[in-house]
Amino acid sequence: MGKYFGTDGVRGVANKELTPELAFKIGRFGGYVLTKDTDRPKVIIGRDTRVSGHMLEGALVAGLLSTGAEVMRLGVISTPGVAYLTKALGAQAGVMISASHNPVQDNGIKFFGSDGFKLTDEQEAEIEALLDKEVDELPRPTGTNLGQVSDYFEGGQKYLQYIKQTVEEDFSGLHIALDCAHGATSSLAPYLFADLEADISTMGTSPNGMNINAGVGSTHPEVLAELVKEKGADIGLAFDGDGDRLIAVDEKGNIVDGDQIMFICAKYMKETGQLKHNTVVSTVMSNLGFYKALEANNITSDKTAVGDRYVMEEMKRGGYNLGGEQSGHIILLDYITTGDGMLSALQLVNIMKMTKKPLSELAGEMTKFPQLLVNVRVTDKKLALENEKIKEIIRVVEEEMNGDGRILVRPSGTEPLIRVMAEAPTQEICDGYVHRIVEVVKAEVGAE
């Protein structure tokens, strides 16, 4: 991670940290780095439903146009929609304005290369070096060499038609409850599932610029669980603000997280001969029960650091086609180049249709270890990881576990938080381990 780029692009409080002035520079320098070898390059831009999206989009567009790039605005669309369309429309770069599952005051900017993949560390470092230069020495085209802007608001439908082709039959006879987090999927997901002839119930589909992720979406699936039970739905599907995550709810109202969705997909893909190298790529945050379930089905697992970009890097390196995170980023590399909530949802419902099994039965084949994750707001993430008292309490707890569980303490990639996670045979033991570590972290480096 650099000075500006975190694990998922540039993030910050809109108009305070992520200002229009910075967005202009990111557009100008990012556009230059990604398109400098092309004459009249094309760059596409999408955004989620945050009120700050228009402000940042205007600044980004200006920065891109100043390099001579032709800019195509997609309007409100999901992050994977931008990734797909970047490649499908032959653009040199794609840009998404979103802070994903973060609250409304935050926003972010992430780039995709012409292949639809997120940027490499080297590309981000090149952009950062330009951002830090005191003098902007980039070429400044004038007159007819300046870029122009156009709108392509039909892009969302083009993307939906593409992912719809990945399922084998329609969803008639199924009742599906959707929670779109008042975000980018609000006008996409209901259309997609209705088009596949499912009966649908919806929530979180009334974005007003202020309510994205507010008590709804993939970070609050318990709200969708109530809707599933109330409507008697067969499955609930919760997306986050930019549509790159999926958390599901079974017909009984139980939450089905990213680990369980990955396991269900892995087992089905293995049975149907689709799982490349018989391997799933996940992060160190995945539940122990996930690894045990894979092992029981003779499926190999490959672990990476936390962040879907690291999962993707490992998938590309090893030639794998399934990976993801417990948080609901599921990457199906046969179809798309980033985590995709709606695509994952299609595959999950398709597996229910093809196996004729309810989601509770499919998810029940994986037994989760009790887990607790606590986020501690800190003054300095780096100091926390170097603190001797924090290191000591982690060592003591790991010794007590004696291999029967695990502890993970790591910094957030996007916020001033330390995440403390434990898994153990019982919830009581698990909670005890976490709270002991949290108390020390708070005492040593906790923010007010």
Swiss-Prot record:
Enzyme Commission number(s): 5.4.2.10
PROSITE patterns listed in its UniProt record: PGM_PMM (PS00710)
Free-text remark on how the cofactor is bound: Binds 1 Mg(2+) ion per subunit.
Classification via InterPro entries: A-D-PHexomutase_a/b/a-I, A-D-PHexomutase_a/b/a-I/II/III, A-D-PHexomutase_a/b/a-II, A-D-PHexomutase_a/b/a-III, A-D-PHexomutase_C, A-D-PHexomutase_C_sf, A-D-PHexomutase_CS, Alpha-D-phosphohexomutase_SF
GO cellular component, one term: cytosol
PTM annotation, UniProt: Activated by phosphorylation.
GO molecular function: magnesium ion binding; phosphoglucosamine mutase activity; phosphomannomutase activity
One GO BP: UDP-N-acetylglucosamine biosynthetic process
Binding-site positions, Mg(2+): S100, D240, D242, D244
Domain of life: Bacteria
Residues modified to Phosphoserine: S100
Reactions that this protein is recorded to catalyse: alpha-D-glucosamine 1-phosphate = D-glucosamine 6-phosphate
One Pfam family this sequence matches: PGM_PMM_II
UniProtKB keywords: Isomerase, Magnesium, Metal-binding, Phosphoprotein
Cofactor(s) listed: Mg(2+)
Catalytic machinery residues: S100 (phosphoserine intermediate)
UniProt similarity note: Belongs to the phosphohexose mutase family.
Family matches, as HAMAP family: GlmM_B
Record function comment: Catalyzes the conversion of glucosamine-6-phosphate to glucosamine-1-phosphate.
Protein name as it appears in the record: Phosphoglucosamine mutase
Native species: Bacillus mycoides (strain KBAB4) (Bacillus weihenstephanensis)
